[in-house]
Amino acid sequence: MFAAENLRDWLGHTVIDPEGNKIGTLEAVYVDTTSDEPSFITVRIGMISRHRLAFVPVTGATVSPKAVRVQYAKKVVQDAPAIDTDGELAATAEPGVFAYYNLDYGSRSERRLARR
């Protein structure tokens, strides 16, 4: 495993938890608008007819030839804030994504996340 430096290269790959349990498929990368660095990924989870995209922080993520490993358990990701597969993250929902993972959102009025 090595650090996940360019997550865009891993779109469509399997995402696993620290124990190696498959969570889903890497769908998109969201960057912090102040640094343009990856901040969250979305992972396609759920049943075939009811897929959704769950947000997961990239801090501590690593990659191997077959998967991206995140630092959160499968159950935590399954319960995380999510959007429809064709949806967009509303600006009003951003603070909730950060709060779910106990991350500081700050008090800035502009958006913190942008899909790349």
Language-model regions, residue ranges each:
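Peripheral interaction segments used for macromolecular assembly
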Residues: 1-116
